[in-house]
Amino acid sequence: MDPTDLSFSPDEINKLIETGLNTVEYFTSQQVTGTSSLGKNTIPPGVTGLLTNAAEAKIQESTNHQKGSVGGGAKPKKPRPKIAIVPADDKTVPGKPIPNPLLGLDSTPSTQTVLDLSGKTLPSGSYKGVKLAKFGKENLMTRFIEEPRENPIATSSPIDFKRGAGIPAGSIEGSTQSDGWEMKSRSLSGAIHPVLQSPLQQGDLNALVTSVQSLALNVNEILNTVRNLDSRMNQLETKVDRILSSQSLIQTIKNDIVGLKAGMATLEGMITTVKIMDPGVPSNVTVEDVRKTLSNHAVVVPESFNDSFLTQSEDVISLDELARPTATSVKKIVRKVPPQKDLTGLKITLEQLAKDCISKPKMREEYLLKINQASSEAQLIDLKKAIIRSAI
């Protein structure tokens, strides 16, 4: 049997409406606190207009009560609001969504009849069958949640709600999420205006919930890797700081090297000057041969002199006791032979000099042989000069 074919008597309709109004008045009579505000952000969409009006009426009633208590007057009883009832329509399509009967608003145009609850007479007409009545009552019991319920409360035994009375256990199920009605509130006072949508766009990257569990196992490894990288970066920064701090020392070393090069150049110049000033003996000519080549000339010796350099048959003019020049016959000069000196130290010195200054092995061996065969100091001196010239 189709439930839409059933009809209700005026008494049953009045009883249903009375039950719904008692429910609404019960919720609107509760004390409004900061956490249970009736703003638009806490009221489910679709019933904002009704609850806002109820909140405003509650505030007005509280204000009138305070004024009446001060003046000592009795509080007048507020008449119940009028509810719009939509007449039954025989052309109802099965499966069509049924609007909320408390709002009195329908997206499709229809005629409405005003029901005055203060009177006892009821106009003709009924809700759209028992399905509409069940829908309205379920919305009242679940705080106007539009999600369909699998086990609705039986209409044969309605619960008697009273103002200020406690709610029996199990009479109201837990609230669930509601998509709300796409309908704006007609009341602008006493309600929070709707919040504008943020212009920020959400990112296109999405994360799958199924991969979270597997990826969570890698979090510790990733964190350890990041910590290791951080420590290595700190070590690198420390090493770079040390290198930068030693840059000044490197510059000092470079300056010292430049100074050493300048000193070496100075020494080379001085050595070259010494070589120029000491040309050495051009040949092996003895002093006696040099004296023979010189012309005869007078030599004045004012003091006592050594006649070892004089030769035989040469006239010498000398001064007598009165400082008069007189000719002096010179006896035959016997050249004095100086005592033999120890040449071992000088030979060792010349051998070391030949090893250090002469790079050619053959020439070095010749000089070493001559040094060992030398028997006089003069020969060793000549070898010394020859070694120095060969080194240059």
Curated annotation (Swiss-Prot):
Gene3D superfamilies assigned: 1.20.5.300, DNA helicase RuvA subunit, C-terminal domain (1.10.8.10)
Record-linked Pfam families: Paramyx_P_V_C, Soyouz_module
Coiled-coil region(s): 219-246
Region of interest called Disordered, as start-end residue ranges on this chain: 61-107, 152-182
Segments for region (Multimerization): 217-280
InterPro entries recorded: P/V_Pprotein_paramyxoviral (IPR004897), Soyouz_module (IPR025909)
Lineage top rank: taxon: Viruses
Keywords of this entry: Coiled coil, Phosphoprotein, Viral RNA replication
Quaternary assembly: Homotetramer. Interacts (via multimerization domain) with polymerase L; this interaction forms the polymerase L-P complex. Interacts (via N-terminus) with N0 (via Ncore); this interaction allows P to chaperon N0 to avoid N polymerization before encapsidation. Interacts (via C-terminus) with N-RNA template; this interaction positions the polymerase on the template for both transcription and replication.
Family: Belongs to the rubulavirus/avulavirus P protein family.
Purpose of the protein: Essential cofactor of the RNA polymerase L that plays a central role in the transcription and replication by forming the polymerase complex with RNA polymerase L and recruiting L to the genomic N-RNA template for RNA synthesis. Also plays a central role in the encapsidation of nascent RNA chains by forming the encapsidation complex with the nucleocapsid protein N (N-P complex). Acts as a chaperone for newly synthesized free N protein, so-called N0, allowing encapsidation of nascent RNA chains during replication.
Domain statement: The N-terminus consists of a long intrinsically disordered tail. The central part contains the coiled-coil multimerization domain (PMD). Forms a four-stranded coiled coil structure. The C-terminus constitutes the alpha-helical domain that binds to the nucleocapsid (N-RNA complex).
UniProt protein name: Phosphoprotein
Organism: Parainfluenza virus 5 (strain W3)
